[in-house]
């Protein structure tokens, strides 16, 4: 029972993280929609609308410095929230250390109206060269044929799961001890 509970807990925690990322992409997509509508209304030129949308998405942050990125349909970075040096580079062939072609997966999966979740590993930052597990969600914005995405590291997810598992184990142990004590006392009372 405890094993099944732990598997269910892990799946639930992962699903919550996935949904959080999905909702954040929906927010960024709505922001881009605002600028696309301004272009359709004639308030902005197409070029000005695109630049404003990319600047707005690039400036968005959440959680612990997580950011958004925008790719064109071919995999070229058109905006990146933390590394502007990537803008203009085609990352379609990029792979993580395990050989996962994560950008190609995003490009392919983002064609779905629901978007796509991709799992891969990537260095967490300049101070941490070791690749860490990450999940990203990406969705196509049809107006400008952009792929809007963001990824979150899940190393903290593993730590949170271990803490929850230990709490569950502790609770189970207390329940077992109480039931054992009650059974022992009941057995003595009957004899």
Question: What positions do the PLM features span?
Answer:
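Extreme N-terminal signal-anchor transmembrane helix of membrane signaling/transducer proteins, especially
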Residues: 1-8, 168-186
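Juxtamembrane membrane-water interface segments immediately C-terminal to a transmembrane helix
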Residues: 7-51, 167
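Extracytoplasmic
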Residues: 87, 97-163
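Short amphipathic alpha-helical segments
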Residues: 50-58
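Cytoplasmic juxtamembrane amphipathic helix immediately C-terminal to a transmembrane segment
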Residues: 10, 15, 183-191
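Amphipathic coiled-coil signal-relay and dimerization helices
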Residues: 76-82, 131
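Short N-terminal helix-loop-first-beta-strand/juxtamembrane motif that initiates sensory/input modules
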Residues: 58-77, 114-119
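Membrane-interface helix-start motif
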Residues: 13, 154-175
């Amino acid at each position: 029972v405890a094993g099944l509970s732990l598997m269910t807990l892990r799946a639930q925690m992962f699903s919550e993280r996935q949904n959080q990322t999905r909702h954040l992409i929906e927010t960024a997509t709505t922001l881009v929609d605002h600028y696309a509508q301004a272009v359709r209304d004639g308030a902005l030129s197409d070029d000005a609308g695109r630049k404003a949308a990319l600047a707005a998405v690039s400036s968005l942050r959440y959680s612990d410095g997580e950011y958004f990125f925008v790719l064109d349909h071919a995999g070229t970075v058109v905006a990146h929230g933390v590394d502007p040096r990537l803008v203009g580079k085609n990352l379609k062939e990029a792979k993580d250390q395990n050989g996962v072609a994560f950008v190609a997966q995003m490009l392919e999966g983002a064609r779905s109206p629901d978007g796509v979740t991709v799992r891969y590993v990537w260095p967490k930052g300049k101070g941490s060269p070791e690749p860490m597990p990450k999940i990203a969600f990406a969705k196509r914005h049809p107006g400008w044929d952009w792929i809007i995405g963001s990824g979150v590291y899940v190393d903290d997810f593993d730590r949170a799961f271990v803490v929850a598992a230990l709490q569950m184990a502790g609770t189970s142990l207390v329940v077992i001890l109480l039931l054992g004590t009650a059974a022992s006392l009941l057995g003595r009372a009957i004899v």
